[in-house]
Amino acid sequence: MIPDVGFLVLLTGALFICIKAAPATTDVDPTFEGRIVMEGDILIREEQLTERNAIALENMRWPDATIVYKLTGWYALFPGDIKKAMRHIEENTCIKFKARSNEEGYVKIYKGEKESCFADIGYFASEQRLSLGSGCKIFGRILHEMGHTIGLFHEHTRPDRDNYITVHEDNIRPGSKRNYRKTPSYMTRVIGPFDYDSIMIYGETAGSRDPMHLKSMEANKPGVTLISSRYKDRLTDLDIKKINTLYNCPGKEKFS
């Protein structure tokens, strides 16, 4: 998630980049390198936001279900859980990961500043970003951000989410309320049933102005607790089936 600050400084190699973000008191989406930051950790290009370009969503799938990546800096030396997450996805879906040679479209995986966890959504024929700051080097968080790279939006912002969860806007910090907007139906393909345990759902106190006492959202289903991806160690069966459906994976179980 990109922090709610007036200015965000990221370290990329030896280059310091100063990013003007939206003030924490507003509900305007901040920007990063020409992308709009949606829902806290999704980078999306402006041309992908208009209804007339909704067909572009079909082109956001990685060609041949192969994600081309480049590990940089710290992660090039210590790929650890990143490679483990890649193997977990490969073992359960038709998605493959390939180290970049000279491909035009690829995802650069790098160590962002502090809690800077975010990723471009899906495929684009240029360099894309997957930032894993020091607070994001956790297996479940890595899987979550890779889910965005694959093309998955958040489960709690599905257009039909109100049937399954209740968002308590009064409990959410002003600068975090934008992270709970429903994704427009023309931007996302709703696949399968709502998954309370998805790797793509936030914990129920994320963005709360008082996490010890106030929930940002909660399940409408009695007895269900919404848990952050940082405490998870795998994709759920529904996550896997959704990815296999999105990429029409041959020989894999899919939603009809």
UniProtKB/Swiss-Prot annotation:
Chief place of localization: secreted
Positions that bind Zn(2+): H144, H148, H154
Location of the protein in the cell: Secreted
Catalytic residues of the enzyme: E145
Gene3D superfamilies tied to this protein: Collagenase (Catalytic Domain)
Keyword match Translocase: no
Signal peptide (from-to): 1-24
Free-text tissue specificity from the UniProt record: Expressed by the venom gland.
Entry GO MF terms: metalloendopeptidase activity; toxin activity; zinc ion binding
Top EC class, one word: hydrolase
Cofactor(s), by name: Zn(2+)
PROSITE patterns named in the record: ASTACIN
Keywords, alphabetical: Disulfide bond, Hydrolase, Metal-binding, Metalloprotease, Protease, Secreted, Signal, Toxin, Zinc
Listed GO CC annotations: extracellular region
Biological processes annotated in GO: proteolysis
EC number: 3.4.24.-
Record note on quaternary structure: Monomer.
Physiological role: Zinc metalloprotease. Provoques deadhesion of endothelial cells from cell cultures, and also degradation of fibronectin, fibrinogen and gelatin in vitro. Its role in the venom is not fully understood but it might act as a spreading factor that facilitates diffusion of other venom toxins. Alternatively, it might be involved in the proteolytic processing of other venom toxins or it might play a role in extra-oral digestion of prey.
Name of this protein: Astacin-like metalloprotease toxin 2
Species name: Loxosceles intermedia
